[in-house]
Design a protein with these regions (language model features):
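Bacterial signal peptide processing site
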Residues: 25-28
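Class I SAM-dependent methyltransferase Rossmann-like catalytic core
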Residues: 110-144
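Conserved class I S-adenosyl-L-methionine
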Residues: 144-155
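A short glycine-rich, Lys/Arg-flanked "PGG" loop and its adjoining helix->strand segment in the class I
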Residues: 164-165, 245-260
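Conserved beta-strand signature within the Rossmann-like core of class I S-adenosyl-L-methionine
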Residues: 174-176, 259-267
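S-adenosyl-L-methionine
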Residues: 186-219
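A short acidic, Gly/Pro-enriched loop at the edge of an enzyme's catalytic core
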Residues: 209, 219-230
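A short, conserved alpha-helix within the catalytic core of class I
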Residues: 216, 238-251
Length: 388
């Protein structure tokens, strides 16, 4: 009886177990996971070609980049120096400057000597008096505190600080300057900024100075027969280097009154020097300078050796800027160049005269009747051309 009952039960248990293990009759093959689809490899990407290296700067581009670098350095140094100069102007110094402007002097030389002794002068400027002899030089040119004076390219104001206070009451000082608001990468704009900063340091001394903006690309002076004295100090070589000497001297002649004076101080080259070459080093031959200026409506009225220096050999690789105050070589042989001092300079006085009128063209002669043709002669040997 028990065996008969256990048989069906055992069969049912086996069936249930089989059903559980096979998911109730589904075949193992039907429930097996499908294999993953093959993954396509990513398409090959060709990297873009490397950019071509920038072209090598040309020699001119390198030169310009170096010039801009030097300009930035010079500007930074000038601005730093100006900050020190502004800070130097204490109330006591301003008071002394005002007193100098108000002081009365018996003559021009005494006025300049009074300005030379002032503490208002920029530090270091008085150290150059022994080389530049301003009282003797200006007296030679006929300077008086009642004149209208034009200082042509005053640089950093070495003469300006002597002229401005002594002309403020009864005279007038005009000073040329380049546009300080010109392009930042233009060195002429920088020079204009330097002089403007100089004037702005002391309204007491320089408040009455009238600046005359000039453009070397279009040389022009607005003054016409109104100036007594033009001071052209250490600037002629720059005019020559830029090919502008004749036109600027002509403009100066036009600005002067009849019999007005042009005072020239210029680094003096050796007599046999070629002007176009020596000008690159800052020097010009004296005889040539006189001839060129007289050709523009001037007459030489006198020479002075106040600024002569026989120690100047004029043969430095760095030109006249090798000497003080520039010391282009830095500390190299500095003592040697300091012992020489500033350059040997011509000091000339010219007076304005009427320009020679150009010769009128000769009236053409009445053409003669053509002569009978002559027998051609043997051609002559051509003459040897003259040297330029």
């Amino acid at each position: 009886m028990k065996k008969a009952f256990l048989g069906p039960v055992l069969l049912a248990c086996l069936t249930a177990f089989a059903c559980a293990t096979t998911a109730c009759g589904d075949s193992p093959e039907a429930k097996a996971p499908a294999p993953p689809a093959p993954v396509e490899p990513p398409p090959a990407v060709t990297p873009p070609p490397a950019p071509a290296p920038p072209p090598e700067p040309t020699a001119e581009e390198k030169k310009k980049a170096e010039q801009q670098k030097q300009l930035a350095k010079d500007r930074a140094e000038s601005e730093a120096e100006n900050k020190k100069e502004v800070a130097r102007w204490s109330p006591e110094l301003k008071k002394e400057a005002t007193a100098l402007v108000d002081k009365q002097f018996p003559n021009g030389k005494a006025a300049i000597q009074g300005a030379m002794a002032s503490k208002a002068r920029k530090p270091g400027h008085a150290d150059r008096d022994k080389f530049r002899h301003p009282a003797e030089t200006l007296d030679f040119w006929g300077y008086k505190p009642t004149l209208t004076v034009l200082e042509f390219v005053p640089g950093e104001g070495w003469y300006t600080e002597l002229l401005a206070p002594t002309l403020a009451k009864k005279g007038k000082l005009l000073a040329t300057n380049t546009d300080p608001n010109g392009p930042a990468d233009d060195r002429s704009s920088y020079y204009g900024q330097v002089f403007k900063m100089f004037l702005d340091t002391s309204p007491e001394l320089y408040g009455k100075v009238e600046t005359v903006n000039i453009d070397n690309k279009a040389p022009k002076l607005p003054q016409d027969g109104t100036v007594d004295l033009v001071i052209l100090a250490r600037e002629l070589h720059g005019m020559v280097n830029q090919g502008k000497m004749d036109v600027w001297v002509a403009e100066i002649q036009k600005a002067l009154k009849p019999n007005g004076v042009l005072g020239v101080e210029q680094h003096r080259a050796k007599p046999d020097a070629k002007p176009e070459e020596s000008a690159k080093n800052g020097y010009l031959p004296e005889k040539w300078v006189i001839e060129k200026i007289e050709a523009q409506g001037f007459k030489l009225a006198g020479k002075s050796e106040a600024n002569a220096n026989a120690k100047d050999t004029k043969d430095y690789a760095g030109g006249v800027w090798t000497l003080p105050p520039s010391f282009r070589e830095g500390d190299k042989d500095r003592e040697k160049y300091a012992a020489i001092g500033e350059s040997d300079r011509m000091t000339l006085k010219f007076t304005k005269v009427a320009k020679a009128a150009p010769k009128a063209d000769a009236k053409p002669a009445t053409p003669a009747k053509p002569a009978a043709p002559a027998t051609p002669a043997t051609p002559a040997t051509p003459a040897t051309p003259k040297k330029p």
